[in-house]
């Protein structure tokens, strides 16, 4: 039985055949819906920010936007596990082990529920201490705490969506998660407008709308898994934690999650420094950050594409195909990100004004866009090379190098360069500086590992 027969044809199972045929078209068909999903999700999140900023004021905008690093800090470890799920299932598909794939799917969904409940409890309990630790201004603290506690009620839904979407990605399906986000996002925007503008619920209305939308997206992804491709079909009654799969998922996913957590810690430190400039700076930074997310999600989509294509082809021992997938993802990811960043920066005042009418907040947003957004494409050097290593099972290496290059250097910057020149512009320069360092480290490690793997 040849590899194609082992892994079942794409036509028969309605899954993408990543092991055979031209790569570029398949990579774009995989990555672009994935990028669209993330960008669409961010558009809906941005709607939260825009509605609050326009109809509730700068304090409410600061309360919602200032929470972003905190939320990322608490969920990144567990979202990292979904990366492990993608790699493990992808490897089993590449090896043609159908029963292992099915076991992994039910293990993944059980882990999603457990992680979600854990986050709900931790996020609710630690909301106030964390917000106080990052110097959240007194006038913003009550609103920020209210938003965070309501937001974390939806964590089980967030985890189910992310883990379920990872399962679908492992078979090349990036379209149905997009459909789930379209539906949930429209619901989110409608609820935002009603709860904030009509019922005057301020940040609580935005948080409630987000929780309901998260519930919808999780329900849809679960439905897709229960009725879709037989190989990854999900039956809630069969949910269990298989030791072998749990260990493999944690081995791949935990370093990625740990990287995300430490990354978020450094961003929380930067957010604390931003908070020191006052409410206007927090609001302006939050506005600019939304555009960084739009561009970063393109890079992240090609990162996940690299992980998935590499995991399947590495499992099938097609190393040259792994190399080609990496090159295509790197070039296309950085090119698209660069074009998007340039457009946002060219019309920076207009885009900043979408989220706030406050002139001082817009000034801060413009500074961040010029110093950070314009160079966002540099993140591709470490994200995509790190994705290639994870696809081959080397998850710890990119995690450690990113911690050293990005996180360690950012904290060092805050206590050295920023101390000497404590301006908002100098604070923002920490981002591109760390991207250059981390990109050199992770790319170098990838080339070394690739050479060693090829020599085996």
For every predicted segment, state its role.
Residues 1-31, 89-154, 187, 198-254, ...:
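Short alpha-helical transmembrane segments in multi-pass integral membrane proteins
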Residues 20, 24-43, 47, 70-77, ...:
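Residue-level signal for short hydrophobic patches within transmembrane helices
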Residues 29-48, 150, 184, 213-217, ...:
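Transmembrane helical elements of multi-pass membrane transporters/channels
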Residues 34, 38, 50, 87, ...:
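Transmembrane alpha-helix boundary and packing residues in multipass membrane permease domains
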Residues 43-62, 131-138, 194-201, 261-294, ...:
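Helix-terminus/linker motif at the lipid-water interface of multi-pass membrane proteins
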Residues 52-72, 138-143, 203-204, 245-252, ...:
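Interfacial/gating helices of multi-pass transporter permease domains
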Residues 61-121, 158-177, 271, 284-348, ...:
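Small-residue-rich hydrophobic transmembrane alpha-helices
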Residues 82, 151-169, 177-185, 206-221, ...:
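Short runs within selected transmembrane alpha-helices of multi-pass transporters and secretion channels
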């Amino acid at each position: 039985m040849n590899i194609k027969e082992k892994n079942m044809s794409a036509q028969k199972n309605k899954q993408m055949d990543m092991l055979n045929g031209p790569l570029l078209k398949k990579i774009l068909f995989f990555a672009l819906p994935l990028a669209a999903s993330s960008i669409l999700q961010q558009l809906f999140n941005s709607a939260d920010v825009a509605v609050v900023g326009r109809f509730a004021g700068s304090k409410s905008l600061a309360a919602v936007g200032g929470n972003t690093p905190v939320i990322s800090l608490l969920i990144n470890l567990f979202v990292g596990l979904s990366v492990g799920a993608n790699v493990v299932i992808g490897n089993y598909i590449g090896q043609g082990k159908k029963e292992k794939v099915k076991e992994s799917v039910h293990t993944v969904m059980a882990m999603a529920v457990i992680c979600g409940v854990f986050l709900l409890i931790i996020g609710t309990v630690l909301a106030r201490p964390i917000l106080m630790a990052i110097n959240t201004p007194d006038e913003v603290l009550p609103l920020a705490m209210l938003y965070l506690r309501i937001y974390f009620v939806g964590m089980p839904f967030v985890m189910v969506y992310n883990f379920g979407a990872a399962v679908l990605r492992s078979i090349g399906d990036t379209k149905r998660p997009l459909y789930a986000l379209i539906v949930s996002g429209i619901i989110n925007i409608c609820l935002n407008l009603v709860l904030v503008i009509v019922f005057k619920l301020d940040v609580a209305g935005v948080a409630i709308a987000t929780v309901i939308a998260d519930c919808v997206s999780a329900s849809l992804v679960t439905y897709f898994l229960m009725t879709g491709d037989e190989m990854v079909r999900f039956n809630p009654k069969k949910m269990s934690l298989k030791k072998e799969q749990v260990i493999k998922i944690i081995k791949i996913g935990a370093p990625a999650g740990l990287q995300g957590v430490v990354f978020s810690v450094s961003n929380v430190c930067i957010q604390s420094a931003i908070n020191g400039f006052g409410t206007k700076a927090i609001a302006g930074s939050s506005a600019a950050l939304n555009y960084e997310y739009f561009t970063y999600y393109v890079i992240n989509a090609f990162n996940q594409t690299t992980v998935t294509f590499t995991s399947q082809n590495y499992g099938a021992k097609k190393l040259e195909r792994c190399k080609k997938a990496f090159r295509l993802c790197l070039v296309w990811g950085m090119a698209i990100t660069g074009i998007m960043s340039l457009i946002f920066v060219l019309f920076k005042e207009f885009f900043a004004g979408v989220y706030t009418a406050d002139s001082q907040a817009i000034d801060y947003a413009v500074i961040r866009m010029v110093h950070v957004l314009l160079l966002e494409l540099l993140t591709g050097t470490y994200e995509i090379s790190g994705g290639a290593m994870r696809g081959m099972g080397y998850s710890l290496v990119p995690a450690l190098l990113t911690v050293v290059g990005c996180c360690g250097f950012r904290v060092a910057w805050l206590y050295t360069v920023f101390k000497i020149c404590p301006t908002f512009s100098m604070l923002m320069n920490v981002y591109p500086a760390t991207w250059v360092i981390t990109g050199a480290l992770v790319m170098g490690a990838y080339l070394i590992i690739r050479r060693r793997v090829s020599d085996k």
